[in-house]
Amino acid sequence: MEARVEQFIENNRLFGMETNVLVAVSGGPDSMALLAIMANLREKWKLNLFGVHVNHRLRGEESNKDAELVQSFSARLGVPCNVKDVDVAAFKAEHHVGTQQAARALRYQVFQGEMERVHATVLLTAHHGDDEVETAFMKLTRGTTPLTKLGIAATRPFANGVLARPLLEETKRSIVAYCHEKAIPYRIDQSNFSDAYTRNRFRMNMAPYLVEENPHIHKHIGRFDRWQEEDNHYLMEQAKAHLDQILTKKSEKSIELEIQALCLAPFPLQRRMIHLILNYLHLNVYGVNDMRVFPDAIEQIQAFLQTSAPSAQLDLPGRVQVKRSYGTCLFTTAPFIETKAYCHLLSIPGKVDTPLGVIRADTREELLELEHTDAVSFQVSQVAFPLYIRNRKPGDKLSPSGMSGSKKVNRLFIDRKVDRAKRDAWPLLVDANDSILWVPSLQTSRILTRSANVQGELLHVTFSQHKWP
């Protein structure tokens, strides 16, 4: 088995000579066998070898015994091994995810930190051929896409190097036999036999029959994946280049683009661009680039972008929201403003903080000639005091300057293409009679129409908007 694993390392160029290698060791037979094999190859390959164990503290004393066994076996092999405890419950509460997702995210955070600490460029995990079969059929069952691998990759970029899986062509049976042959100790996690987890159900109920039909099924899945991966790599590079061309804004938590530019692209590129966007946002939320994109999610987004409504919002799992506003589409994880009704007295001089920005008021001796709509200047005698800053109410209307009749504030927002997420938070300047004097940045009322002969004290009100993702 050692010779096969070494050949796999060479064929797939998992790492070279004189490399700093970190092995993730859980205490189970797979990772303990991997650690032993790497310890045997250490001198020949001139490796600096390290181990890391993550104690998720999910099984009480059993978890502690796993950690103790890993430490003692690593010491026996002369491999420095660091054990790190993590708080899965706290991560679950903060990020609103399940136990398995929280444990995985924390585990890989530890792996990244440990790679940096020991200056490792390669992280080895003990995924094997049976895992590949389980993974492939789990993905097919839940609805995978050709955008991602069907099985498990031999390598992938991770932290400041790569994550590699040297045991992918080995079966579970061969690994356990190796442990018995070499007297390698290991522990069995009893939760691996629980029907509560999807992977366990596939492992116990489906995989044995598939392996019985063809003991080399994991190799066939691997070959299928390699061919598909080459095809997908080419299409994904095309999608990345096209996405870079149509992006209008990009931040850590949001991506904005023109809807028409996305919809004009061929469907294979559309799907891959959406996939790239979701992965980018998911990485910034959880710190792990493992977003599982279901086909119906991608198609749902495509259909959403084709709707005739000028503005709409789509909520997706993973705290991702897709918002279309007229010709643009915003993919974001940034929280949208949730505004309750507010009404604040506007002191003169003074200021009012609103969810969208700051309103300031002061008196002036001269009427300003304004060249923008973020400020308004008028005679104090024109309005009924006190003045207030509030957000909109149902049925709000104003009498627009330069127009006859009245206009609903909601219609004003629509006509001026104000983002739906901002409308309920938008500040309005009203007088003592609750008449709308000014919709900042959008419209003034006829009440503030300037007279030919300006006399008396003048009031100047400005609106400074916050930055919006």
Swiss-Prot record:
Biological-process GO terms, alphabetical: tRNA modification
Cell compartments where the protein resides: Cytoplasm
Reactions mediated catalytically: cytidine(34) in tRNA(Ile2) + L-lysine + ATP = lysidine(34) in tRNA(Ile2) + AMP + diphosphate + H(+)
Name of a matching Pfam family: ATP_bind_3
EC number(s) on file: 6.3.4.19
Enzyme class: ligase
KW Cytoplasm (keyword) present: yes
GO MF, one annotated term: tRNA(Ile)-lysidine synthase activity
InterPro entries assigned to the protein according to its UniProt record, in alphabetical order: Lysidine-tRNA-synth_C, Rossmann-like_a/b/a_fold, TilS/TtcA_N, tRNA_Ile_lys_synt, tRNA_Ile_lys_synt_N
Alphabetic keyword roster: ATP-binding, Cytoplasm, Ligase, Nucleotide-binding, tRNA processing
Residues at which ATP binds: 26-31
Keyword RNA-binding: no
GO CC, any one term: cytoplasm
Record remark on domains: The N-terminal region contains the highly conserved SGGXDS motif, predicted to be a P-loop motif involved in ATP binding.
Function: Ligates lysine onto the cytidine present at position 34 of the AUA codon-specific tRNA(Ile) that contains the anticodon CAU, in an ATP-dependent manner. Cytidine is converted to lysidine, thus changing the amino acid specificity of the tRNA from methionine to isoleucine.
UniProt similarity note: Belongs to the tRNA(Ile)-lysidine synthase family.
Name of protein: tRNA(Ile)-lysidine synthase
Organism, as annotated: Shouchella clausii (strain KSM-K16) (Alkalihalobacillus clausii)
Lineage: Bacteria, Bacillati, Bacillota, Bacilli, Bacillales
